[in-house]
Amino acid sequence: MRLKFGNPVINVLGYFFLRNCRRELLRKAPGAGLPDADLLVARIRDHTQQVFDASVKALPDPQAGVIYAYCSLLLAAFREFRAEASDEAGAYAFARTVFQQTLEGPWLWLIKLWLWLVRDPVGFLSRWSLARYFQRNQGTSMEFAEEKTDDAVVLVVRRCAYHQFFVDHGEPALTPVLCMFDRVWMEIIDRAPRPIRTERPSTISTGGDSCRFRFIRDHNKRGVEPVDVVLVQLQKPPYAAAEDPNVG
């Protein structure tokens, strides 16, 4: 049985997510106490479909369906690994790794292309509306605003359907694992030669009233330490997993 999210692109993404689950399970040591990889992947697939199907009819728009597909995949991978291995930190690490492996490639190239084309990224964002773009792209279950100054643009997320999904399913601590995917594009921006760096001083998932993404014009950004509340949060349990002796 294949995953059916009602969107062919997201169906393909689900296929690659499950493929990456299998690869990650096969990479782990034989003594990790896990069952056959194909069996666990089948359970993740079935769990994902059950969670998604239970919610899809009540969703307000197709964009919410995409959000719930992502979240259902992450939730199922986390819960099935945790149930089998009795290892919560390991389950967080597994779900986070597989999610990032699945999505980081397309984002990496899109952000790099944007930075190559645009000499003054903050100026570009000042003339454009990030809030309008994301509102159209993410749908009515999300709420966005923006703030602009001469040298900075701030994207504000006032309502997050991703976090609400995990709250509703009793796993609010999973949201920062999903949020950590934003580090992919944030780090690309921060390391690029263009005069722009990012900050994320607050998120809803870490107790803030909103998620704030700052895009700051900075010609002297080299060596500046990242400002990211999620990066700090993921250094603490339950997210911080013990080092895997089989890595490296």
Predicted regions: what they are:
Residues 210-218:
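C-terminal edge-of-domain segments
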Residues 151, 207-210:
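A short, glycine/Asx- and small/polar-enriched loop/turn
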Residues 162-165, 219-224:
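Short, charged/polar, Gly/Pro-enriched secondary-structure boundary elements
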Residues 1-81:
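N-terminal, charged low-complexity regulatory/assembly segments
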Residues 69-75, 79-175:
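Amphipathic interaction/junction segments at domain boundaries or subunit interfaces
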Residues 199-204:
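Short, solvent-exposed loop/turn elements at beta->coil junctions and helix N-caps
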Residues 135-138, 189-196:
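Short secondary-structure junctions
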Residues 176, 228-248:
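Short, cationic low-complexity segments
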